[in-house]
C-alpha cells in the first residue's frame, strides 16, 4: 500500500513541478476570449484555439492597467504563468500582461472610448459653444517649454497686440499628465478675466498624445464654462480632446487665429468703415432737414403768420360769448330762487308753529302716561291669574280641602287600571298618611 499516493500528495507534487518549471513561470500565449462576463474586480474567462481550452484569470490590479475592455471572441496576446489550483486539481493561466492581437492596445482603447462617449452625447454639435469675436485675455494650457506657446504668442501679438496670454504650465505627456490638464482647465474656469482656452501640445506618437484621450480630460473640456480650442499634435493626429472641444485647430498658429478671428487691422478697418457710414448718415440727415426747412419757410404759415391763429381767435370769441350768456342766465336763476326763499320766510308765523309743537308734545306725554298705566295693570292681572294657577297645583292645599292623594311606589295614581288586588298603597291626608292593602278593585266612571 505504500506505493500508492494520495490525491493530495500527487496534486502537491504536480504544483511543485509547475512552480519550479522555468518554461511555465513565463508563458506567451495567443488565444481567443471565451465565456467572458465582466466582473467588478477579478476577471475569469477561458482562452481557446482550434484544439484546446485553458482557464485564465486577470487580477483586478492588473486588469486596470491593460487599457482596453475584453470582449467575447476577441483574439489577444497574453503573458502569464501557469499554476495548479490544489482543491480542484485544475490548472489555469494567471495573466500579467495582455494586448489585442493584430492591433495596438491604445488604438483599441481609443476606439472603445470614442464609441462610448459618442453614445453619451459628448461630441454632439448642440453642446459646442461659439467663439467670441473679440477677446481680451486667452488662457493656454500647454507645456511652458514647447513650441506651442511660442507660436500662439507670436500669432496673437501679430494679429491683435492688445490681447493678453495667460499660460497655465502643464505636463502634457507621461504619468500624471491627464490629471494636471484637468486641474488647469478647472483653474482657468474659476477666473473671470478669461474669454476662452487653448488646450494643446506638439506632435508625437499615440503614447505621447495619450493624455488627451483620457476620459477625465474629455469630461473636463465638455464641462468647461469657457469655450475651448484644441490643438493637439500635427494635422494628421486626432485625439478625443479634438472631438469634444468647441473648435479644433490643426496647428498652434491656427488655434491662435481662431482665438482672434478679427485682427487688429480688421478691427481698425471695421471702425473706420462704421465712422464713415455714421458720417454719411449725419450728412444725409442734415441735408434732408435743410431741404425740409426750405420748403416750410415758403409755406403760407410763414409768409402770413397771422393766419396761423385766425381760427383760434374765432373759437375764443365764440367761447367768450357762450360764457357771458351762461353767467347771465345763471345769475337770473339764482336771483329768482333767492326771492322765492325770502317770500317763504316772510310768510311763516314762528310763534304759532312753536305753540303747535308744545301742544303736540303735551298730548304725546299724556298718551305715554296712559299707555304705561294700562300696561302695568294688564301685567298685574296676568300675574295674579298665574299665581292662582300655581296655587291650585299645590298638593298641600288640595289635601287641606279634604282630598287625599293615593301613591304607588312614591308616584301618584290617577286610574285604578294601575292597581291590582293585594298591592300596598300609601294614602296622603291632611294630617298624615296611611299604608293600605288593596282588597278589591271596582271600576266606576265619575
From Swiss-Prot:
Q: Where in the cell is it found?
A: Cytoplasm
Q: Does the keyword Ion transport apply?
A: no
Q: How does it assemble?
A: Heterooligomer composed of large and small subunits.
Its catalytic activity?
A: Exonucleolytic cleavage in either 5'- to 3'- or 3'- to 5'-direction to yield nucleoside 5'-phosphates
Protein's name in the database: Exodeoxyribonuclease 7 large subunit
Quote the cellular component terms of the Gene Ontology held in the record: cytoplasm; exodeoxyribonuclease VII complex
**One GO-annotated biological process of the protein:** DNA catabolic process
Amino acid at each position: 500500500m505504500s506505493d500508492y499516493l494520495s490525491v493530495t500528495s500527487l496534486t502537491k507534487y504536480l504544483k511543485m513541478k509547475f512552480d519550479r518549471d522555468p518554461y511555465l513561470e513565463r508563458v506567451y500565449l495567443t488565444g481567443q476570449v471565451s465565456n467572458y462576463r465582466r466582473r467588478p474586480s477579478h476577471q475569469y474567462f477561458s482562452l481557446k484555439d482550434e484544439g484546446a481550452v485553458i482557464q485564465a484569470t486577470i487580477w483586478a490590479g492588473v486588469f486596470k492597467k491593460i487599457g482596453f475592455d475584453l470582449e467575447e471572441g476577441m483574439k489577444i496576446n497574453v503573458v502569464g504563468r501557469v499554476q495548479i489550483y490544489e482543491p480542484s486539481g485544475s490548472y489555469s493561466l494567471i495573466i500579467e500582461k495582455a494586448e489585442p492581437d493584430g492591433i495596438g492596445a491604445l488604438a483599441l482603447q481609443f476606439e472603445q472610448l470614442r464609441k462610448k462617449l459618442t453614445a453619451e452625447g459628448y461630441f454632439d454639435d448642440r453642446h459646442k459653444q461659439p467663439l467670441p469675436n473679440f477677446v481680451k485675455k486667452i488662457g493656454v494650457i500647454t507645456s511652458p517649454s514647447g513650441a506651442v506657446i511660442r507660436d500662439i504668442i507670436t500669432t496673437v501679438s501679430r494679429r491683435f497686440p492688445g490681447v493678453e496670454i495667460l499660460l497655465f504650465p502643464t505636463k502634457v505627456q507621461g504619468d500624471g499628465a491627464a490629471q494636471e490638464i484637468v486641474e488647469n482647465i478647472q483653474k482657468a474656469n474659476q477666473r473671470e478675466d478669461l474669454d476662452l482656452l487653448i488646450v494643446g501640445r506638439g506632435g508625437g506618437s499615440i503614447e505621447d498624445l495619450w493624455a488627451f484621450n483620457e476620459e477625465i480630460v474629455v469630461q473636463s473640456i465638455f464641462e468647461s464654462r469657457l469655450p475651448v480650442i484644441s490643438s493637439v499634435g500635427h494635422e494628421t493626429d486626432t485625439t478625443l480632446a479634438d472631438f469634444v472641444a468647441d473648435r479644433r485647430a490643426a496647428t498652434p498658429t491656427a488655434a491662435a487665429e481662431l482665438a482672434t478671428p478679427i485682427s487688429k487691422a480688421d478691427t481698425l478697418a471695421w471702425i473706420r468703415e462704421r465712422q464713415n457710414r455714421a458720417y454719411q448718415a449725419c450728412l444725409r440727415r442734415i441735408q434732408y432737414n435743410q431741404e425740409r426747412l426750405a420748403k416750410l419757410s415758403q409755406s403760407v404759415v410763414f409768409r402770413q403768420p397771422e393766419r396761423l391763429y385766425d381760427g383760434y381767435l374765432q373759437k375764443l370769441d365764440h367761447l367768450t360769448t357762450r360764457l357771458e350768456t351762461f353767467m347771465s342766465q345763471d345769475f337770473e336763476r339764482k336771483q329768482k330762487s333767492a326771492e322765492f326763499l325770502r317770500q317763504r320766510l316772510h310768510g311763516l308765523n314762528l310763534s304759532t308753529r312753536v305753540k303747535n309743537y308744545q301742544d303736540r308734545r303735551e298730548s304725546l306725554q299724556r298718551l305715554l302716561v296712559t299707555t304705561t298705566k294700562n300696561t302695568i295693570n294688564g301685567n298685574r292681572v296676568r300675574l295674579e291669574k298665574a299665581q292662582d294657577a300655581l296655587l291650585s297645583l299645590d298638593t298641600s292645599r288640595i289635601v287641606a280641602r279634604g282630598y287625599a292623594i293615593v301613591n304607588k311606589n312614591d308616584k301618584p295614581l290617577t286610574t285604578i287600571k294601575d292597581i291590582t288586588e293585594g298591592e300596598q298603597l300609601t294614602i296622603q291626608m291632611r294630617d298624615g298618611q296611611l299604608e293600605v292593602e288593596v282588597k278589591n278593585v271596582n271600576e266606576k266612571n265619575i
